[in-house]
């Protein structure tokens, strides 16, 4: 497959799965397993690693564009509260929740970075992905069936942010999905579908941005005209498609539960496990 077409398709896959609770990283690995980049002038593994995180930044930018009014208004409120010019602490609490929510995965990810890199090299990675999709799907269906009532009015507070932050660490396991870990954990505490999804979006901004900066520094030696072109192209595709996917996703969950995503994970997990066992 031509590398430009490969980058285009990966950008679409990233955009379609990043903020859905189905694991974008798992889908990208599955695609690269069958359709790797060809004839690159740089080490393939390093470029694959950088490309995946780079196109995630495109998806992140779509969140910033879609929610810039919310992010900016909360920032203004936080600054005014910090300077003592306002008693409204909602903006300050918003960003405090985000900081608390990202610290566990940043710390654990840093401590385990060498082990996490080794996981991608394992011969049984497909089995790990399949099991993660399957088990995560069962948990998602179970949680949604128990929390279909949206009348509790529970919102994301400091305590909820801590719990979501720690449970987000499970997303370090390939196939678990950062979105699934954060959404499911919020839903178990009675938070609405909308608030659970949006908090997951907001958590992704600092987590994936910092991960992108780290990967860019780590693989800086492979940057050249060929790789930069593919990275930017994939990111632009991811940004454009993800902008519309998020809007469709939010419209979907206003009417439906997350059960369909759980069923999808179960079926995909079974297919991947069967493929691994057979081949």
Swiss-Prot record:
Name of the encoding gene: uppP
> Extra info from the record?
Bacitracin is thought to be involved in the inhibition of peptidoglycan synthesis by sequestering undecaprenyl diphosphate, thereby reducing the pool of lipid carrier available.
Its keywords, alphabetically, are:
Antibiotic resistance, Cell inner membrane, Cell membrane, Cell shape, Cell wall biogenesis/degradation, Hydrolase, Membrane, Peptidoglycan synthesis, Transmembrane, Transmembrane helix
Role noted for this protein: Catalyzes the dephosphorylation of undecaprenyl diphosphate (UPP). Confers resistance to bacitracin.
A Pfam match: BacA
PANTHER family according to UniProt: UNDECAPRENYL-DIPHOSPHATASE
Q: What class of enzyme is it?
A: hydrolase
Tell me the compartments it is located in: Cell inner membrane
What's the protein called, per UniProt? Undecaprenyl-diphosphatase
**What are the GO BP annotations of this UniProt entry?**
cell wall organization; peptidoglycan biosynthetic process; regulation of cell shape; response to antibiotic
Q: Which InterPro entries match?
A: UppP
Q: Which organism is it from?
A: Leptospira biflexa serovar Patoc (strain Patoc 1 / ATCC 23582 / Paris)
Q: Which residues cross the membrane?
A: 17-37, 46-66, 92-112, 123-143, 156-176, 197-217, 226-246, 257-277
Member of which family? Belongs to the UppP family.
Q: Name one GO cellular component term.
A: plasma membrane
**EC no.?**
3.6.1.27
Q: How does it sit in the membrane?
A: Multi-pass membrane protein
Q: Which molecular-function annotation in GO is an example for this chain? A: undecaprenyl-diphosphatase activity
The UniProt catalytic activity note for this protein reads:
di-trans,octa-cis-undecaprenyl diphosphate + H2O = di-trans,octa-cis-undecaprenyl phosphate + phosphate + H(+)
């Amino acid at each position: 497959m031509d590398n430009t077409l490969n980058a285009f398709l990966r950008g679409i896959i990233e955009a379609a799965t990043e903020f859905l609770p189905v694991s974008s990283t798992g889908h990208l690995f599955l695609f690269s397993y069958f359709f790797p980049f060809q004839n690159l002038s740089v080490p393939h593994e390093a470029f694959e690693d950088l490309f995946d995180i780079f196109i995630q930044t495109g998806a992140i930018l779509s969140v910033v564009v879609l929610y810039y009014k919310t992010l900016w208004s909360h920032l203004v409120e936080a600054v005014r509260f910090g300077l003592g010019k306002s008693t409204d602490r909602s903006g300050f609490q918003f960003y405090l929740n985000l900081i608390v929510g990202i610290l566990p995965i940043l710390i654990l990810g840093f401590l385990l970075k060498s082990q996490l890199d080794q996981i991608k090299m394992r011969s049984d990675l497909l089995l790990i992905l399949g099991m993660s999709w399957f088990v995560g799907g069962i948990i998602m269906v179970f949680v949604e069936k128990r929390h279909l009532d949206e009348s509790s009015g529970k919102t994301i507070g400091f305590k909820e942010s801590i719990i979501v932050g720690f449970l987000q660490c499970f997303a370090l396991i390939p196939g678990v999905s950062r979105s699934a870990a954060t959404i499911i954990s919020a839903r178990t505490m009675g938070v609405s579908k909308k608030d659970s999804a949006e908090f997951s979006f907001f958590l992704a901004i600092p987590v994936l941005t910092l991960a992108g900066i780290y990967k860019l520094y780590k693989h800086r030696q492979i940057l050249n005209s060929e790789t930069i072109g593919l990275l930017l192209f994939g990111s632009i595709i991811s940004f454009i498609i993800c902008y519309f996917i998020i809007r469709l996703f939010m419209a979907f969950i206003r009417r439906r539960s997350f059960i369909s995503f759980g069923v999808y994970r179960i079926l995909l997990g079974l297919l991947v496990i069967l493929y691994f066992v057979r081949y």
